């Protein structure tokens, strides 16, 4: 078994929507990023890479490389998961916590879980996404951006 933890944050700016958990969430602003700014999938990528001791998302998809400009984070997640499988591992479960005062995530959580489960080739009962606020505190509380944490458990492939 291997455990990984990931964290990501992006600042609001420009036009919406917000892409998070592989889902387009309507909002008046988007997130400033080199790729599509999907904090949930970026945190998940970092958790997976950490679990296999392969660094972080910046090492594999650097924001200094125009190849990744505007990249679809679902494609990045699938690429990272390919690396996981190459190590003889598969997802046991993933738990994602989105920290945002806005936009409201609840109506989109099921769709996020479905997108993540699809990209990680697993069943819905192995993926959990939840959202919380910071009770008006800090940059997320002031609606300046969104943060996300992710934890994964990887297990040996069951073939």
UniProtKB/Swiss-Prot annotation:
Names of required cofactors: a divalent metal cation
Catalyses which reaction(s): 4-CDP-2-C-methyl-D-erythritol 2-phosphate = 2-C-methyl-D-erythritol 2,4-cyclic diphosphate + CMP
Cofactor note: Binds 1 divalent metal cation per subunit.
Alphabetic keyword roster: Isoprene biosynthesis, Lyase, Metal-binding
Binding site residues for a divalent metal cation: 8, 10, 42
GO molecular function, one term: 2-C-methyl-D-erythritol 2,4-cyclodiphosphate synthase activity
Recorded metabolic or biological pathway in which this protein acts: Isoprenoid biosynthesis; isopentenyl diphosphate biosynthesis via DXP pathway; isopentenyl diphosphate from 1-deoxy-D-xylulose 5-phosphate: step 4/6
Annotated SUPFAM superfamilies: IpsF-like (SSF69765)
Superkingdom as given in the UniProt entry: Bacteria
Family: Belongs to the IspF family.
Subunit and partners: Homotrimer.
Name of protein: 2-C-methyl-D-erythritol 2,4-cyclodiphosphate synthase
Species the sequence originates in: Aliivibrio salmonicida (strain LFI1238) (Vibrio salmonicida (strain LFI1238))
